[in-house]
Amino acid sequence: MPQSYCKRSLTLHLVPFSLLMFSSPALLAADQDTSLRLNQTIEYRANQQEREFLKDELPNDTAAPLLNIDGQDYSVGNNLDELGRAVYLSIERQQWLHAKDYLKRYTALPGHDLMLSAYANGALARAEGNLEQAEDYYRQLLAMQSDFLPGRLELARVLFENRKDRESTVAFQQISSSLSPSDAQAMGLGKTVDSFLQALDHREDWQGSFAIGPIWSDNLNQSSESSFTYRMETSEGTYLITRALPKAVSAHGADYEGTLNKRVAISGHHGVFMRSLLYGQAYDKQSKYNEGTLINNAGYSYHDARNQYAFGPSFEFNTIGDDAMYSAWGLRGEWIHNLSATRMFKLEGDYKDMAYKHDINSNLDGDVSSVYATLWQALPQQWTLFGGVDLTDRNSQDRTAAYLQKGLRLGVAKDFGIGVSAVLFASYRKRQYDAYSAILDARRNEDEQSYTFILRAPRLAVQDIVPSLTVKYNKVQSNIDWLYSYDKNSISLKLEKQF
């Protein structure tokens, strides 16, 4: 008797598969590269804006050689008068090796000026980055003569550089109030003092940015578009079953992102901070793929010349398709260390407890722990190279959705000096899931690649609104290829306002 054949849709089987799609890390948690980029951009922009306030006060590396007048060098005799003048001029012209040598000879002579010695030692300590020691020397100097204006100004500068913002503000304000408006020299000094006071005010101002613009994406549903037909034999007959995933969904919409940050100095290096990140997309005629993320963080902050620490509670809220997807309370900490004038290291860590809003996703409830390490290296001609590693441990009630993720990031940035800058960075992450899935008959593992290119054009800014172009490519390769592997492209053109 011939066997009966028929084609049967896999509609019933796709019901659990549609639930499994929610275990995609892209839907489980906020875009890691985006949140990292926005967090790291906050510090960079704050430093750039501060340098703009102080552009006329930054050290000049083109100072003339010591005691060179009209191209002729003059020798310095071994006496208090000539050595004292040489010490002062070498400090003024930032000739630190000369200054150290002349100061050693000067202080070896009996009757040397203790005020000049303290002033020079303070300047040398500051040049070497020993700001606490420099502060001690300048305070010794002012203990000898409290109204010595150069000493007061240098102490205020050291407090500023060492991030003792409250004390520095008081010092500059006292200098400003003591200057005579009718004195031409005081007017020049007053401009310097005002620049530092503006920079100090800016440190405690609300700082942020907001960008919005059109976006196009070609695979909103992260579909592999796979189709496979196989034969299943049963006691009732033999069936041809087609297993197919939907076509990739493309759409236009709006892409947006914003940051808001504030730090308040309390005393010395200590303060408190508040920070918010907002980013997401909203699509025309495909609102079920809309996604938005809000991350708030506040707590304790410590700043000095070489280190920044921040630690405190965080709250994250995510929506998909205009409906709440999850909320997550947690803790976040970071450490920024300036290794040198051209090299910086940042270590970030966060822990959050994710609670999904719908019972259908409650099996995904669980905690996420992440650590990110990033190193920046400034290169000649305004190039910057950066890279890092990250580790994420995701737990959930459903062990088949829990995973350990290891990542590597690498990027390069270039300021072209013509009002245009560009950033290109890539990330590679490998996920190993915790448990075997009986539904999928496999233990899931994935490799994910992401590439992002950002082009900004400040020279085209209108009313300080800067256009930027962002191009992204994302590729996921899964051992469960037919369900979880996909490619995704997006391009957006945003207008950004900083404040």
Model-derived regions, located:
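Bacterial N-terminal signal peptides that target proteins for export
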Residues: Q3-V15
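Gram-negative and organellar
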Residues: A30-G71, Y88-E92, K100, Y119-A127, ...
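A structural motif in tetratricopeptide-repeat
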Residues: V76, P110-G111, Q145, L179
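Alpha-helical segment of the N-proximal tetratricopeptide repeat
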Residues: N78-L109, A120
